[in-house]
Amino acid sequence: LEFIDMAKELDDLDSLLTKLESSKDDNYQLKLDAAIKLVTSDRVEEALKMLLSIVQADRMWEEEKARKTMIKIFDLLGKGNELATRYRRKMFALLH
């Protein structure tokens, strides 16, 4: 429900992805917004890839907002979920 509530405030997914493609800079907020919309569109792996790219580029952006959002997605997916396990490892490898 948290992601659905967050997504209500955002532009539609196609619009966000178009803005992202045309953006010359690495717009982390736009990536975060798109990732939230991707989660609510059942495109979770794409969302995790996008968030991981933010963590890789600037771990501390907005007080680690991308990393914290990834953790919320892992919690949503549940323990033992293969996708969550894979991306948790990728995130851990970047951070350590």
Feature roles, as predicted:
Residues 1-96:
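Non-globular targeting/processing and membrane-anchoring segments
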